[in-house]
């Protein structure tokens, strides 16, 4: 395998309600107790950082695998079937008696949503689910994991360091809030770190973006990428700062956009070792995903991505530290 994605797997149900339930001032969705809320439409898809990125890597031409934990239910079958259709290796997936992860994504006003998340079998992932002798990959992509599952990630990263496997890491707000000490065993072996500004500040503190990138790189990562939703993305490799702003596109749903960008960026690094190209590939992937429901539906194949990048060219600025 070129890359093994490690992380969560879920079945997502997107539930869209009338915009009147959303208060843009308070940024809250109001649902009255005892009321019956009419739903405009429902859409089912698979999700989770592990499976989203595995499919993205496969579509971008890499030999990809998924390592995670599923239940023994219909949701697990749905996920495995889709992974096989997308040519993702699932031989390392383990099973639990706990139900497969499930999310309800409540959309109330265009791109605004609330996610109700049942972690389920994802939180059952443990070090004993890692079979080192079968993990032949050049890269590990690690999406966020919590509790005992994160302890398993620490073991995985130790294996990577001892076997010259490169690591890409995309932590969540939950992990970032734990601080640098909690993350140090992973961060010191990371090649590519991708996170958003809020997560970066939870780890480092309230600093400007370029300073965040410098401080994060001092913790171990070779390349640090900090995103800001539709705002400017900054990448830093220890010598050069790269910055770019995504194209404005019509947003349908933002779920999975972070996974799409991160996987596109990492795929770009694997293929070319060029940060500028990787940024453009990541943005192309994310810009397409947010134009459709579901975290995987609009993930691009490599040919589609290159065509999109030529048509919607993004300027990447460079500056030396």
Residue ranges with predicted function:
Residues 64, 90, 167-168:
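Hydrophobic beta-strand scaffold residues
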Residues 91, 95, 105-150:
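Conserved phosphate-binding/catalytic loop of the ribokinase/pfkB sugar-kinase fold
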Residues 68-72, 91-99, 224-228:
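Beta-strand->loop->alpha-helix junctions that form or flank phosphate-binding loops
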Residues 157, 163-166, 174-243:
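Conserved phosphate/ATP/ADP-binding segment of small-molecule kinases
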Residues 1-67, 77-78:
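Glycine-rich phosphate/adenosyl-contacting loop at the front of the ribokinase-like
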Residues 3-4, 13-17, 176, 210-321:
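Conserved phosphate-binding/catalytic region of the ribokinase-like
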Residues 54-63, 107-108, 268-272:
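Alpha-helix C-terminal capping segments
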